[in-house]
């Protein structure tokens, strides 16, 4: 069906230090990230075979991660980069980031992007009340639909998979080395 790359971060830190983490090429970590690194799994790239696109294959990948976590309860945190295609219109990227910054902000400054995405512009933030997640999500979907696009699958999955407060977007940045 597909695969998700992940690595136990404490083990990787013991072997290769902080430079052994892919996310460290994208983010500088603060002290508040230490407990996450000690009990975390860094999620990397994933793929789904084309024959399974459009099915519940991503759910199966999540079930596999869940089964791993059930057998290894020492891991409490999943973290990693999630991309937004550069093929999306700039306005769509700005709206997505404004929405996710508003509703899923970092509770503590645990990581800072090495290549920060510009702060959300007031005209993008004004699209959302910040008071009603479901109404603002509906608004985001409509705005993106007008631009001919939709919320990227992993953004939807991450925010819907976890219980309230269970997902945070620590920072937003660009990865000059990442190709669409």
Each model region followed by its residue ranges:
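Acyl-donor binding region in acyl/amide transferases
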Residues: 11-166, 173-174
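Conserved beta-strand in the GNAT
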Residues: 2-8
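Extended effector regions of multi-domain proteins
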Residues: 176-179
């Amino acid at each position: 069906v597909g695969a998700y790359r992940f690595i136990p971060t404490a083990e990787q830190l013991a072997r290769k230090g902080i430079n052994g983490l892919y996310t460290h090429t994208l983010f500088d970590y603060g002290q508040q990230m230490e407990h996450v690194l000690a009990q975390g799994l860094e999620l990397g790239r994933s793929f789904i075979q084309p024959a399974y696109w459009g099915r519940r294959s991503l759910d199966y990948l999540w079930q596999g991660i869940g089964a791993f976590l059930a057998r290894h309860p020492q891991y409490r945190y999943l973290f990693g980069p999630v991309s937004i295609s550069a093929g999306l219109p700039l306005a769509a990227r700005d709206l997505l980031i404004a929405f996710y910054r508003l509703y899923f902000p970092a509770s503590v400054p645990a990581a800072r992007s090495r290549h920060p995405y510009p702060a959300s512009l007031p005209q993008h933030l004004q699209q959302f009340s910040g008071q009603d997640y479901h109404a603002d999500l509906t608004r985001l979907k409509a705005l993106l639909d007008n631009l001919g696009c939709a919320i990227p699958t992993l953004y939807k999955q991450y925010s819907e998979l976890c219980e309230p407060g269970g997902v945070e977007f620590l920072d937003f940045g660009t990865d000059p080395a990442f190709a669409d």
